[in-house]
Amino acid sequence: MGRVEYLKKEYSDEEIYEILEKPVKEWFKRKYKTFTPPQRYAIKEIHEGKNVLICSPTGSGKTLSAFLAGINELIKLSMENKLEDRIYILYVSPLRALNNDIERNLKEPLKEIYDVAKEIGIELDEIRVAVRTSDTTSSQKQRMLKKPPHILITTPESLAIALNSPKFSQLLSGIKYVIVDEIHALTNKRGVHLSLSLERLNRIANFIRIGLSATIHPLTEVAKFLVGNGRDCYIVDVSYKKEIEIKVISPVDDFIYTPSEEISKRLYNLLKKLIEEHKTTLIFTNTRSATERVAFYLKQLGVEKVETHHSSLSREHRLEVEEKLKKGEIRVCISSTSLELGVDIGSIDLVILLGSPKSVSRALQRIGRSGHRLHEKSKGIIIPFDRDDLVENVVLAYDAKIGKIDRIHIPKNCLDVLAQHLVGMALEKVWDVDEAYNLIKKAYPYKDLSKKDFLDVLNYLAGGIEEKNVYAKIWLKDNKFGKRGKSVRAIYYMNVGTIPDETAVDVIADGKYVGEVEEEFAEKLMKGDIFVLGGKTYKYLGGRGNKIRVKEVFDEKPTIPAWFSEQLPLAYDLALDIEKFRKEVLSSDIEEIREKYDIDEKTAKAIKNYMDEQNKFAIVPDDEKVLIENFDEEKRRYYIFHFVAGRRANEALARAFANYISKIKKCNVRISVNDYGFALILPKNRKIKRADITELFNLDVVKNVKESIERSEILKRRFRHVATRGFMILRRYMNRKISVDRQQFNAEMLLKYCKEVNHPLYRETLREILEDSLDIDNALDYFEKIKRRKIYYLELPSPSPFAFNLVVSASSDVIFMEDKKKMIAELHKKVMEFISMKGKK
């Protein structure tokens, strides 16, 4: 196993200048005067051939830390007339926009170094820089073959294609440095895909790996992910060098009784005031629709130079906005998630987060966009929308200040990505099975890959399922494998990558089209679920291909709000801290809370009142107590499980519990889930007894979640994604794009067969849903925690304050914002009446 350790030595300017060639040293002295912290730790170590992961804030000279040792080597070769026509430095970024940035940011210093060299009488050969992505034309690729760049900038997908390009791959064999930027954005299947590409590249080239990351935890795991198994990695962590200021500012004192229009008015007035106090402000919302809404209202208030930036806008528009931001021509820019990553956007004075960013690392990435230089303070303001949001943001801001960051999740042993790379490898040469297995296991996400899973994927690729029109891509014989047929290369080129084709799903009622929903929303549906579309309420009956069947229902409350798919989930570590905070608030006075959490008196009071109300009405569920509450409505019974585990883990537990209860009570059980718990909703003639609750806590969670998944839309959708990644279903064939409708239809034809034979791609679909979507590991961890707590099962006259959002959010599509406020106010009045009655007894 390779060693992972933190670098302790910070080199002086003189020590770094010693290793730099004269033109580079002279240029650096003129332009920068002195090295920044990440440069002091990293440059010399990279020069000495060490793999390095650099974690430092935006504007700290991180990119130059990564490139300078390599550029210095290229200048040295150029001075010695030894610079060959091949690629020396490979830079990989998940963002195409970032690639264009880097190209610009490299060409400028290289030109300046030439000018300095000329001045001091040194002639240099030109160091070429080029970008190769899906936007690169055939003629540009041809030019690269004739005159290769010395520095190549690319994306994970384009690297996978380049590895299999017979001529171009030869140019990769001399690579000395590989730089992976924004590695924190690659802790997903795209990153898993890249980790295998790097191992395949390592077979033909011996290179140093350099990773660049924003604040992420744990860095030791990211380091292993960067370098793979058996290699050393050294971590430069200077994220603490940047001063950060985070404040939680509430637009109103009272979220319950202040009318919506008033909250809205005060919110936009607050935003206007903050914008006017700063030169450039960046506002993050949590949904794309909110982005446009905020921009509209700010313009109405007379705020000038307002722009939006999100993934639904055209690339041209986004680039134009980035350019304007850089030039300081925008007063305020509103974004959803698209500006979280490191595209250079110049100087931002203030970052405002509307609503909770749901994780400390996301908050730090967003707020880190302000105070672009290392010595400047990053300034962020979080504006909560309700009482739960207020509590969450106070805990989040505190965790951010003390540097407590939520853990990342890197998918493991993804069999669909493995299948794709095995096809790519078969195109390179004939492989010995064990040699290929050992190469795959060097990639960190595959270190524990079983030989059985590996052979199952090879056998699938060699056997195909011809009766289902899935043809073999490789041959496998005598412990060796290679490519099969001429069309395999084209299939690989046209279908490589991990990002599935997304589409809208048609909604059909009584044979008629009534609208469409996002696929991400459709995959959450289970039979009997109720949702709202175009102001009408529908019950989900089932789905086939790219259509879902529904029937219109009346007097039924929705179980899934329409915005569910756009919501960010609460990080598990932060959720656990919220539980501890609840207990702390109950046992502290207002002054103690105010001081420790650096909040104003009215915020501390609002939080204290919220906890007291809950405590007087029921109990406060925290890290020692579990609350399960039951209350009845006219037609149904609600059972609310106050589990603070984040929405993904809660959905796993809710599915497991609902599956079990529906079997023993022989009825349909609906669920409604949020970050703070879930509701099981039963018909009025069914009841969950205390004995049933005891049984729930002895449940086989995984078995029940799997049973639930097998009945829901998510399995069909995710199987298509996995099957396209694993080349069982093609997205493009013979220069033709295959529609998502067709892909989905093919997936459903294959799903039954794959389930029957326990196919590796079926197993991968279940793994992806359980581990990557539903966060099963944390769900099981939480399940064990609550078993050790004191459990309170209370029958209540109406929902407790902590349950308001869960009860109302399910209905928030049928009711307008104003009615939602009224509904919460009504529930609150009932709570206060009950408390006062209790007080009189």
Swiss-Prot record:
Keyword Calcium tagged: no
Annotated site, Wedges between bases of the loading strand, chain positions: 499
Function text: DNA helicase that loads on single-stranded (ss)DNA and translocates in a 3'-5' direction, probably involved in DNA repair. Archaeal orthologs have double-stranded (ds)DNA and/or RNA:DNA helicase activity.
Protein name, as recorded: ATP-dependent helicase Lhr-Core
Span list, region WH domain: 417-500
Domain Helicase C-terminal: 266-416
Subunit architecture: Monomer.
Family membership noted in the UniProt record: Belongs to the Lhr helicase family. Lhr-Core subfamily.
Reactions it catalyzes: Couples ATP hydrolysis with the unwinding of duplex DNA by translocating in the 3'-5' direction; ATP + H2O = ADP + phosphate + H(+)
Motif (DEVH box): 181-184
Keyword DNA-binding recorded: yes
Top-rank lineage group of the source organism: Archaea
Entry binding sites for ATP: 39, 62-63, 181-182, 352, 369, 372
Region of interest (Domain 4), residue spans: 501-841
Broad class of enzyme this protein falls into: isomerase
Species for this entry: Methanocaldococcus jannaschii (strain ATCC 43067 / DSM 2661 / JAL-1 / JCM 10045 / NBRC 100440)
Annotated EC: 5.6.2.4
PANTHER family: ATP-DEPENDENT HELICASE LHR-RELATED-RELATED (PTHR47962), LARGE HELICASE-RELATED PROTEIN (PTHR47962:SF6)
Single GO MF descriptor: DNA binding
Entry domain remark: Composed of 2 helicase domains, a winged-helix (WH) domain, and Lhr-specific domain 4.
